[in-house]
Regions:
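Switch II of P-loop NTPase G domains
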Residues: 2-6, 30-34, 57-74, 237-238, ...
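Switch/connector loops and helix/strand junctions flanking conserved nucleotide-binding motifs
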Residues: 24-27, 59-62, 92-97, 114-117, ...
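Switch I (effector-binding) loop of TRAFAC-class P-loop GTPase G-domains
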Residues: 196-199, 220-250, 259, 264-269, ...
Length: 403
């Protein structure tokens, strides 16, 4: 995989840049930059300053206006900042012009996410997927790269007659992309065989926004340790475990979390992870109820799921982290409209129970609150699916050791 863009030796300091547009109001942009700061922290970067600008659309040359770019430059120079991160994907022209003006390292949201994925990838499969995504991202941006890729390959004897350095680099990357795609086809074939060999057990997939507690819930349900951390994208590789509830076995998979503005390169590269979602019989959508914008996160996940798989699948909504939920009651004489922070947990429960009927539950995976109720719900849903598929199968009546 490509070397990390962000140094691991010491914590880098960075400034964040976001645009307020007709599509993104000021409140939304602040939320997006909160998430960008969390992404930066996950990558080992401390976000020390944020810059906002109100524009109808991004400047095609420098993303922000010339005056704002000058303001950023003055801050960067005065405070010896070495990194500026933009919340949206930058074009080749924008990257080149911003780097030329600021004379520091520039990342956009996509590049930052790719860097985190490169750090998180553990298996050969995940590493191959990330490397493919990196090269796809790099290809249209070759003109502004500071170093040439042919150094990684020796260079001598590799250039065709009359080729420029840029053409050589493009060919090297295209060759790498082709090889990585071939590698992934072979890996995906193996994964597909593994999935087919799982037998008649019902498949349940945990899905949700990143950092909502899917891995913690996986640990609680499967009684085996899956890596869980308060960082974005703690899980990259799909983990599959056999879970037994009241003598009923099923397969439970923990998948990579979704996020706003997820790069197309990553969505396409992580095909095998998405296959777990496509081939699942039941989806368990885990939500962080304590997050101030959890409803928008639900929309992001549902939108991504509809892009992955057009078929309707049964789903259970699991509202996690009720132990961390807080709200601010309104004073009686406060006539301003209520916001999300003024709504208590009981009201949210009533709203979502009414919307989802019996397919909704509120838990704390960390504190094990309401886990027995979730297991009972899973038991009923998995049993329904199994009986529908195998009405005369004695599979449900075999004896299993829950330990």
């Amino acid at each position: 995989m490509k070397e990390f863009i962000i140094s691991e030796a010491q914590t880098e300091k960075a400034v964040l840049v976001g645009l307020i547009t007709p599509e993104q109001n000021e409140q939304k942009v602040k939320e997006y930059l909160d998430e960008l700061a969390f992404l930066a922290d996950t990558a080992g970067v401390e976000a020390v300053k944020r810059f906002y600008q109100r524009l109808d659309y991004p400047n095609s040359v420098t993303f922000v206006g010339s005056g704002k770019l000058q303001e950023i430059k003055e801050y960067v120079v005065e405070n010896e900042i070495g990194l500026v991160i933009f919340d949206d994907e930058l074009s080749t022209k924008q990257l080149r012009n911003i780097e030329k003006e600021l004379q520091v390292k520039i990342l956009d949201r996509t590049n930052l996410i790719l860097d985190i994925f490169a750090r998180r990838a553990q298996t050969a499969h995940a590493k191959t997927q990330v490397e493919l995504a990196q090269y796809k991202y790099m290809l249209p941006r070759l003109q502004r790269l500071w170093t040439h890729l042919e150094r990684q390959r020796g260079g001598v004897g590799m250039r065709g007659p009359g080729e420029t350095q840029l053409e050589t680099d493009k060919r090297i990357i295209l060759d790498k992309i082709s090889k990585l795609k071939r590698d992934l086809v072979e890996i995906d074939k193996q994964k597909s065989v593994q999935r087919k060999n799982r037998g008649k057990m019902v498949r349940v997939a945990l899905v949700g926004y990143t950092n909502v507690g899917k891995s913690t819930l996986m640990n609680q349900l499967s009684k085996s340790e899956v890596f869980a951390e308060n960082k974005l994208f703690a899980t990259l590789d799909t983990t599959v475990r056999k879970v037994i509830v009241d003598n009923l076995p099923f397969l439970l998979s923990d998948t990579v979390g979704f996020i706003r503005k997820l790069p197309t390169e990553l969505v396409e590269s992580f095909k095998s992870t998405l296959d777990e979602v496509r081939e699942a019989d039941l989806l368990v959508h885990v939500v962080d109820i304590s997050h101030p914008t959890f409803e928008e996160q639900i929309e992001v996940v549902n939108r991504t799921l509809s892009e992955i798989d057009k078929t309707e699948k049964p789903m259970i909504m699991v509202f996690n982290k009720i132990d961390a939920f807080t709200f601010v009651p309104k004073d009686e004489d406060d006539l301003t409209p209520r916001t999300r922070e003024n709504i208590d947990l009981d009201e949210l429960k009533r709203t979502w129970m009414n919307k989802m009927q019996d397919n909704c539950i509120f838990i704390s995976a960390k504190e094990r609150t309401n886990l027995d109720a979730l297991k009972a719900l899973l038991y009923e849903r998995v049993k329904q699916i199994h009986i529908t598929r195998f009405p005369y199968n004695d599979f449900l009546f075999q004896q299993y050791d829950e330990e």
